[in-house]
Design a protein with these regions (language model features):
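C-terminal transmembrane bundle of multi-pass solute transporters/carriers
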Residues: 4-5, 84, 101, 115, ...
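Helix-loop boundary and gating motifs at the non-cytosolic
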Residues: 22-81, 241, 245-293
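Helix-breaking motifs and short loop linkers at transmembrane-helix boundaries and internal kinks
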Residues: 65, 97, 119-120, 336-337
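Hydrophobic alpha-helical transmembrane segments
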Residues: 127-134, 138, 163-221, 291-295, ...
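Helix-boundary and loop/linker segments of multi-pass membrane transporters
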Residues: 28-33, 48, 120-124, 227, ...
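Flexible cytoplasmic inter-helical loops of multi-pass small-molecule transporters
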Residues: 20, 211-238, 432-436
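Intrinsic disorder in cytosolic terminal tails and internal cytosolic loops
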Residues: 1-31, 425-436
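Substrate-agnostic recognition of the 12-TM MFS/MFS-like secondary transporter fold
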Residues: 37-54, 77-93, 97-112, 129-188, ...
């Protein structure tokens, strides 16, 4: 019996033993895996492109109109498609191949932000035409963002969701660091329209990289049943019911994201106005300051790579501390006139802002069934963007009526409110973990 007891485990559990030994081999860093590395490279190219085009767009409108309100229209237009179409786009992200959205969006943006500005003469390249291009670009982004985030679980292990999200955000950081600086120099040398024209190539390269990515099919398990197959309207209602009744932590997350978006979108849209009016800076200097924000984002993205072993509640608590630091640094901008001090504050603000999105995406990815991630992200985007468009509008009016200092102070207060919601969300998740 003793020999029988030894032989049977050795013979029947050989496969299991080999499986247990696999984790002992250190996994390859995410950036050096084929599929995630290609996604990261594609995002780097498109984010650098965004960094170049964003400053060029805002500077073009403000230099022509001289109006903070008309400048904020750029930001407002960017938020309309996610608000109106976000939940329904999420339904089709769950139903259709995600590469269709990933590749198609980048090709479409290359045509919009590259080829069209090249084809239109300087005399006919008006602010109204630019508004139209921005609206179509926002539609492409509304399709791309949920497709990208819901693709992460198809190529990355669950334990590395936050790390993967942080690495994806690091491309945003690098885009903010290099994009505006290149854009500022390009605007000074050539002009806004020419910068947009040359920038279209970045989106074509991004599409090429995404074309080589291999996404695993999402296979529903016993605990994650198939949730698609009915009508699109039925799928939409299932996603709404999941957020509203089955997983209310995500509903609180959307509320927190709305508060964050209310302040962050206003800061991003109005920053050229603040820098030009309060500090008297030109496009090159504004580009460098914007790059400082990107440095902070990059540092936080790197820090989050070491937070994957923490519980979800502990990771969410980082939002509380990061938002509080950002809020205080934004308020301090009111009194600081030295450009080097302002650069340090912008790094602090960027670091605080950099914590939110990777952690928030991780909450959605970990608490949502695989076949429903697109719909939940669509609802998340609608809530966040509705708040963002409100923040841009409100602070555009505040800045125009009461001055830039009042606008900055108000944005800082919103970040402090985000810190409160982050603490509340962390406690709610901790209570949920204890209940389980």
């Amino acid at each position: 019996m003793k020999r029988w007891a030894i032989r049977i485990p050795n013979r029947t559990s050989q496969h299991n033993v080999s499986q247990e030994k696999v984790p002992a081999v250190p996994p390859r860093p995410l950036l050096f895996t084929r599929d995630f590395g290609l996604i990261w490279l594609s995002q780097l190219m498109s984010q650098v492109g965004d960094g170049v085009s964003n400053l060029a767009l805002l500077w073009f409108v403000y230099s022509i109109t001289g109006s903070p309100v008309k400048t904020t229209i750029i930001g407002l237009i960017h938020t309309i498609p996610p608000i109106v179409l976000g939940p329904f786009i999420g339904v089709y992200v769950d139903r259709l191949p995600k590469k269709f959205f990933l590749i198609g969006s980048n090709v479409f943006r290359a045509v919009l932000m590259g080829i069209i500005p090249c084809a239109v003469s300087t005399d006919t390249f008006t602010v109204n035409l630019l508004y139209g291009l921005v609206f179509l670009d926002a539609m492409a982004m509304a399709m791309f963002s949920p497709a990208l985030t819901s693709s992460v679980p198809m190529i990355v292990p669950r334990a590395q969701f936050t790390a993967a999200n942080a690495l994806i955000q690091s491309t945003t950081s690098l885009g903010i660091i290099f994009g505006p600086a290149v854009s500022g120099v390009g605007i000074a040398l050539f002009g806004s329209q020419e910068v947009l024209c040359l920038n279209g190539a970045t989106y074509f390269v991004a599409a090429l990289c995404l074309g080589m990515v291999r996404l695993r099919a999402a296979q529903p398990s016993a605990v994650e049943p198939e949730t698609t197959g009915g009508s699109a309207w039925q799928d939409f209602k299932e996603g709404l019911a999941f957020v509203a009744t089955k997983q209310r932590v995500i509903l609180l997350l959307i509320l927190t994201a709305g508060c964050y978006g209310f302040g962050a979108s206003a800061l991003s849209t109005l920053f050229p106005v603040f820098a030009r009016k309060l500090l008297g800076l030109g496009p090159v200097e504004v580009g460098y300051l914007w790059s400082s924000l990107g440095i902070g984002l990059l540092v936080m993205s790197i820090v989050l790579l070491w937070c994957t072993e923490r519980t979800l509640a502990d990771r969410v608590n980082i939002i509380f501390w990061a938002s509080a630091v950002s809020g205080l640094a934004i308020v301090a901008l009111v009194w600081m006139k030295d450009i080097y001090v302002v650069s340090v504050l912008m790094i602090m603000i960027g670091g605080g802002m950099g914590a939110f999105t990777p952690i928030a995406w991780g909450v959605v990815q970990e608490l949502t069934p695989r076949m429903m991630v697109g719909r939940v992200l669509g609802l998340y985007g609608t809530g966040a963007m509705t708040a963002a468009i409100s923040g841009i509008s409100v602070f555009g009016q505040i800045t125009e009526r009461f001055g830039e200092s009042m606008g900055i102070a108000g944005i800082g207060a919103i970040f402090l409110l985000t810190a409160f919601f982050g603490s509340w969300l962390s406690r709610s998740i901790r209570n949920r973990e204890r209940a389980l």
